[in-house]
Amino acid sequence: MSNIPTELKYASSHEWIRKEEDGSYTVGITEHAQELLGDMVFVELPEVGDTVTAGDDCAVAESVKAASDIYAPISGEVIAVNEALEDSPELVNSDAYGEGWFFRVMPSDETEVDALLDAEGYQAVIDEE
């Protein structure tokens, strides 16, 4: 069974977000998603300054098995990207909720966070797959 930290919020498309002290949100993919994808070989990230819209694809994770679109869980401006993934995409596999984060977003509508799933709700999504 995948690790699903209770302090994070989740999208049914297998992304997680964590609120940071500056009001931004860090975005990554869940441990469950990286297990399904397998060993990461390349991650394409949005650019700092890009505007992302909740539910729209904004990044790509390529593994030995497949390429998968990554969707923005919330709308806002990308304020940082995890440049370490350029040389070490395997960080997504080894530390999905830590060093394997994808990008940070300053939200344009923080109420979108309320529409995301808690850990229990995300577990229910996995159970239905």
Curated annotation (Swiss-Prot):
GO terms for cellular component: cytosol; glycine cleavage complex. Keywords: Lipoyl. InterPro entries: 2-oxoA_DH_lipoyl-BS, Biotin_lipoyl, GCV_H, GCV_H/Fam206, GCV_H_sub, Single_hybrid_motif. The modification N6-lipoyllysine is found at residue 65. Residues 24-106 form the Lipoyl-binding domain. It holds the Pfam family GCV_H. Binds 1 lipoyl cofactor covalently. The keyword Lyase does not apply. One of its GO terms (biological process) is glycine decarboxylation via glycine cleavage system. The keyword rRNA processing does not apply. Its cofactor is (R)-lipoate. Belongs to the GcvH family. The glycine cleavage system catalyzes the degradation of glycine. The H protein shuttles the methylamine group of glycine from the P protein to the T protein. NCBIfam families: gcvH, PRK01202.1. The glycine cleavage system is composed of four proteins: P, T, L and H. This is Glycine cleavage system H protein. It comes from Shewanella sp. (strain W3-18-1). The gene is gcvH.
